[in-house]
């Protein structure tokens, strides 16, 4: 607290000569006082409230003197009115209030607001203004009033999502939608609820997906079983019945030079038969298929991707006509073998076949001598006739009996070379080309499953083999007839004649 003399000096310095002290001023600062200037007899405040405490940072007398010196009604601005008016239009008060000629006005206003007993909050909380009014409390009535509709910009009224149509317009839209979308009836609604404006009758119609039409060309030349029901199918391994596979002939050539020339002659004959319809060996090896039925390519009107297997679509389109020609060649040769005079002699080659593949008389004679030489090998001389007896019996019983039976052959050398081995050994008359399956690119179990799928689940299967094919058959619960010697073929013939082919 400043002494009385210092306060008097400060007041005299600030007021100058134009200021007079009110006689009611109490130098002690404990009583009420009032200050006035010569320019205006009014004051900012005349007395402090009786309940206002006196322990402030600045003495009452000094604060009153400062207020009297700088306070005048002509320069006083209400902070509440100015700030409130500015806040309604802008985010901040006017900048001119802080840069006025008399800076003390700002502090005077703040001091007045702080000293006032009840000061109104300058920033009024007004209700935010939006494009629509919302109820204060969320009640059912208020919620029902708020309709989720779009505002009609032109008319200013709320319009529903679905505008009700009159009977004529709805019928027109229904007829157009029915003709375009292919639906039987389309109801867009003709009446609406008065409270909400939503059409009371709105029937949704289902859109039918239009799938692209695919016209498939029917497979030609197919000799699949179709609707025929087979009672039993016998699966043969070509290595056990023809005994002229490439692996077998290669092993004979390396182990015994005496049979090397005869084995090479037979291998050359197989290649000549295959090349009768194909350009080279790589072509039918690259385009090898599991079954001759797979060579038929469906012609579609829409583009199709590559076939999901081991060959591409381009390869199949190139070799499909050649497989068709090979099928015809195999069928014609099998038919001639059944005609009297063209039946292949046992332990020899079909000379008609040799002539068709381009062999002359000299080459045919050499092949005949090679066949006689190879007959001295174990299981080679007697295997062909024994296997042919069994397979021919299956075909004969199938023709005479109401039940159907079939022979199926598995080839490790591919479809074309497997068919060539059957033609060389004379077994092609008992095995249609459609019943030859190649296991060179697919596993044996996959081929077995394909055979089962083709002939049906009601058909029983018997596998005649001596190799590891028996293991694959057992895993699929297919009975196996072990074949280790020619004696096993004789036993099989007896079982076929008495039990397995209907007695």
Swiss-Prot record:
The gene is eya-1. Mg(2+) binds at residues 237, 239. Belongs to the HAD-like hydrolase superfamily. EYA family. Its cofactor is Mg(2+). Expressed in body wall muscles. Expressed in BAG sensory neurons and in other head neurons. Transmembrane segments: none annotated. Tyrosine protein phosphatase. Acts probably as a transcription regulator in the embryonic and postembryonic development of several tissues including pharynx, vulva and gonads. Required for the development of anterior tissues during late embryogenesis. Together with ceh-34, required to specify the coelomocyte fate in embryonic and postembryonic precursors. In the anterior part of the embryo, prevents apoptosis in cells that are not fated to die. Together with ceh-34 activates proapoptotic factor egl-1 expression to promote motor neuron M4 sister cell apoptosis. GO terms for biological process: cell differentiation; egg-laying behavior; embryonic morphogenesis; locomotion; mesodermal cell fate specification; negative regulation of apoptotic process; negative regulation of extrinsic apoptotic signaling pathway in absence of ligand; nematode larval development. Its main location: nucleus. It is found in: Nucleus. Keywords: Developmental protein, Hydrolase, Magnesium, Metal-binding, Nucleus, Protein phosphatase, Transcription, Transcription regulation. It is an enzyme of class 3 (hydrolase). InterPro entries: EYA, EYA_dom_metazoan, EYA_dom_sf. Disruption phenotype: RNAi-mediated knockdown results in severe lethal arrest at an early larval stage. The pharyngeal structure is disorganized and the anterior tip is thinner. The phenotype is more severe in a pax-6 (ju468) mutant background. RNAi-mediated knockdown in L1 larvae causes a decrease in resistance to heat or oxidative stresses characterized by a reduced lifespan, reduced heat shock protein hsp-16.2 expression and increased reactive oxygen species (ROS) production. This is Protein phosphatase eya-1. The active site is at 237 (nucleophile), 239 (proton donor). Interacts (via C-terminus) with ceh-34 (via N-terminus). GO terms for cellular component: nucleus.
């Amino acid at each position: 607290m400043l002494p009385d003399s210092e306060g008097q000096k400060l007041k005299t310095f600030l007021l100058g000569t134009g200021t007079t002290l009110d006689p009611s001023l109490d130098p002690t600062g404990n009583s009420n006082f009032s200050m006035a200037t010569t320019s205006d007899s009014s004051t900012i405040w005349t007395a402090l409230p009786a309940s206002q405490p006196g322990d402030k940072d600045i003495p009452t007398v000094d604060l009153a003197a400062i207020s009297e010196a700088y306070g005048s009604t002509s320069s006083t601005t209400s902070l509440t009115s100015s700030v409130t008016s500015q806040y309604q239009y802008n985010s901040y008060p006017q900048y001119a209030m802080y840069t006025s000629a008399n800076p003390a006005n700002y502090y005077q206003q703040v001091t007045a607001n702080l000293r006032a007993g009840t000061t109104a909050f300058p920033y009024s909380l007004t209700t935010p203004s939006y494009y629509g009014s919302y109820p204060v409390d969320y009640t059912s009535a208020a919620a029902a009033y708020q309709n989720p509709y779009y505002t009609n910009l032109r008319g200013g009224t709320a319009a529903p999502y679905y505008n009700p149509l009159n009977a004529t317009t709805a019928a027109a839209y229904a007829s157009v939608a029915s003709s375009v979308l292919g639906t039987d009836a389309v109801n867009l609604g003709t009446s609406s609820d008065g409270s909400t404006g939503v059409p009371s009758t709105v029937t949704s119609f289902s859109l039918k997906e239009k799938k692209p039409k695919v016209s498939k060309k029917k497979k030609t030349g197919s000799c699949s079983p179709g609707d025929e029901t087979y009672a039993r199918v016998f699966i043969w391994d070509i290595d056990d019945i023809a005994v002229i596979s490439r692996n077998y002939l290669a092993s004979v050539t390396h182990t015994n030079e005496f049979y090397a020339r005869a084995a090479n002659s037979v291998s050359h004959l197989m290649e000549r038969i295959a090349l009768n319809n194909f350009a080279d060996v790589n072509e039918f090896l690259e385009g090898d298929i599991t079954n001759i039925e797979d060579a038929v390519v469906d012609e579609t009107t829409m583009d199709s991707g590559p076939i999901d297997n081991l060959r591409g679509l381009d390869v199949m389109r190139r070799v499909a006509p050649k497989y068709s020609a090979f099928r015809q060649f195999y069928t014609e040769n099998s038919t001639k073998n059944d005609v009297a005079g063209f039946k292949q002699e046992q332990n020899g080659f079909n000379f008609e076949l040799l002539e068709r593949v381009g062999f002359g008389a000299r080459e045919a004679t050499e092949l005949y001598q090679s066949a006689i030489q190879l007959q001295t090998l174990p299981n080679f001389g007697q295997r062909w006739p024994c296997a042919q007896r069994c397979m021919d019996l299956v075909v004969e019983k199938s023709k005479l009996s109401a039940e159907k039976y079939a022979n199926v052959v598995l080839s490790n050398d591919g479809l074309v070379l497997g068919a060539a081995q059957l033609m060389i050994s004379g077994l092609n008359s008992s095995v249609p080309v459609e019943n030859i399956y190649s296991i060179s690119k697919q596993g044996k179990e996959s081929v077995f499953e394909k055979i089962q799928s083709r002939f049906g689940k009601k058909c029983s299967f018997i596998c005649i083999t001596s190799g590891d094919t028996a293991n694959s058959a057992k895993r699929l619960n297919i009975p196996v007839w072990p074949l280790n010697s020619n004696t096993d073929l004789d036993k099989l013939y007896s079982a076929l004649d008495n039990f397995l082919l209907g007695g």
